[in-house]
A protein has these predicted regions:
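Nucleotide-sugar donor-binding/catalytic module of glycosyltransferases
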Residues: 1-168
């Protein structure tokens, strides 16, 4: 049983999905990690790329799909429900982890603090690699984080039970 599940939702991300998956496979951890990909009936070659990774890494990569597109919200829900890890890290098919120690550091931080979730600063870039949003400032309080809403989805790691309780 993996300690961390990476919940990766995707739709028409053929240009990005390999980088997203490879960034998880490159993680240095002392625990098990699985990648659960919610593929929402892409019209490009995203599903084929995901299936190739599933065949190459059958103990790590699982693809969740359906005969018809279910939309972003339902795709997240079914992918989260398919995750088996105690923790879930979010990563969409057009994002990637830039630090190969990300998951190890975040699990350590959550376990040391006894927290339910954590997130990191991030930098958002355009398709041409131009920085749109530079790394955000550190927040002084939980209220700041909620009001400023700068916790990017792809930086979040949370306890699975908390996500299932609150994600609707």
């Amino acid at each position: 049983m993996p300690l961390v599940s990476v919940c990766m939702t995707t739709y028409n991300h053929e240009a990005y999905i390999s980088q997203a998956i490879e960034s998880v496979l490159a993680q240095h951890t002392d625990f098990g990690v699985e990648i659960v990909i919610g593929e929402d009936c892409s019209t490009d070659s995203t599903l084929e790329i995901c299936r190739q990774y599933e065949q190459q890494y059958p103990d790590v990569v699982r693809v969740v799909t359906s005969p018809q597109n279910v939309g972003m919200h339902a795709n997240y829900r079914r992918t989260i429900e398919a995750c088996r890890g105690e923790y879930i890290a979010m990563l969409d098919g057009d994002d990637y982890f830039s630090d190969s120690n990300k998951l190890q550091m975040q699990v350590g931080a959550i376990e040391e603090a006894g927290a339910a979730m954590c997130y990191t600063r991030s930098e958002r870039k355009s398709q041409t690699k131009i920085t749109i949003y530079p790394q955000g400032k550190l927040h002084d309080s939980f209220a700041d984080m909620l009001i400023l809403n700068t916790a990017e989805n792809c930086t979040t790691l949370a306890r699975r039970d908390m996500i299932l309780r609150y994600y609707d």
